C-alpha cells in the first residue's frame, strides 16, 4: 500500500523472489579486482487454519573472476570458534547454520536450502504460548582456483552440509531456546563439536 512515507507491506503473498548483482571493477573506487557476483532467492510458505505453517527457502549464489577471500560466500555460519558447547551459546539466526564455524568454508558457487515447520502455539496459559519449530538446512558449494588464496586453510562444501534441529520460542518475554545438530559428510569426530545450543528472540508488536 502507498502511504505518505512510501510503500508499506500490509499482507505477504508467495512466492517471494529477490536477487542481487554485484560487479567489481579493477581501478574503480580503489578496487583491486575484477569480478561478478549474482544471487537469487525464492521463499514460499504454507499457512494453515490451525496456525501451523511450513516455510521453504532456496537460494543460489554464483561468482566469477578475481573474487577476493572477503567477498566469497560463507553459507551463513553462526558458531563461534570455541571448544565447549556453552562457550558457543549465542543468538540463533533466522537463516544461519548454527553448527557451522566462522570461516570454516568458502565458496564461489553456493546453493542453500531450508525447511521450517511451525507447529501451532501451545496454549498453556494466557501469558505462556510457546511455539515449536522443526528446522532442516542444507548447503552445497564449490570453489575454483582455491590456490589464489594463500596462507588460508580452504574448506569447500561440495559434499553437502546438513543440519537439523528445533526451536522452542516465546518461553519468556519473547525469548526461547534452540538446538541444532550437524551430520553427513562434514560431521566432526567429537560429538560436542556437532551440537549447537542457542537462544532465540521473537517479539510481536
Question: Which functions belong to the PLM regions below?
Answer:
Residues 4-12, 16-122:
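C-terminal outer-membrane beta-barrel translocator/porin domains of Gram-negative envelope proteins
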Residues 30-32, 68-71, 126, 144-148, ...:
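Short conserved micro-motifs at the rims of enzyme active sites and ligand-binding pockets
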Residues 193-205:
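Outer-membrane beta-barrel "beta-signal"
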Residues 15-19, 38, 54-58, 113, ...:
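Transmembrane beta-strands of outer-membrane beta-barrel proteins
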Residues 26-29, 99-102, 150-154, 184-189:
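Extracellular loop and loop/strand-boundary signature of outer-membrane beta-barrel proteins
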Residues 21-27, 46, 60-66, 119-121, ...:
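Transmembrane beta-strands of outer-membrane beta-barrel pores
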Residues 67, 117, 130-173:
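Outer-membrane beta-barrel transmembrane domain signature
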Amino acid at each position: 500500500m502507498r502511504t505518505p512515507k512510501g510503500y508499506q507491506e500490509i499482507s505477504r503473498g508467495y512466492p517471494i523472489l529477490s536477487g542481487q548483482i554485484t560487479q567489481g571493477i579493477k581501478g574503480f573506487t580503489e578496487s583491486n579486482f575484477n569480478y561478478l557476483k549474482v544471487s537469487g532467492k525464492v521463499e514460499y510458505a504454507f499457512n494453515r487454519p490451525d496456525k501451523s505453517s511450513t516455510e521453504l527457502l532456496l537460494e543460489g549464489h554464483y561468482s566469477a573472476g578475481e573474487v577476493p577471500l572477503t567477498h566469497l560466500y560463507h553459507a551463513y555460519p553462526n558458531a563461534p570458534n570455541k571448544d565447549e558447547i556453552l562457550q558457543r551459546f549465542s543468538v540463533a539466526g533466522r537463516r544461519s547454520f548454527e553448527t557451522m564455524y566462522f570461516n570454516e568454508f568458502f565458496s564461489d558457487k553456493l546453493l542453500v536450502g531450508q525447511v521450517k515447520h511451525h507447529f501451532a502455539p501451545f496454549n498453556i496459559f494466557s501469558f505462556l504460548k510457546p511455539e515449536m519449530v522443526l528446522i532442516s538446512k542444507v548447503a552445497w558449494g564449490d570453489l575454483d582456483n582455491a590456490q589464489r588464496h594463500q596462507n588460508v586453510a580452504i574448506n569447500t562444501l561440495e559434499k553437502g552440509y546438513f543440519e537439523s534441529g528445533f526451536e522452542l520460542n516465546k518461553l519468556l518475554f519473547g525469548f526461547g531456546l534452540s538446538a541444532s545438530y550437524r551430520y553427513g559428510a562434514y560431521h566432526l569426530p567429537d560429538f560436542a563439536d556437532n551440537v549447537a545450543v542457542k537462544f532465540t528472540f521473537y517479539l510481536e508488536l
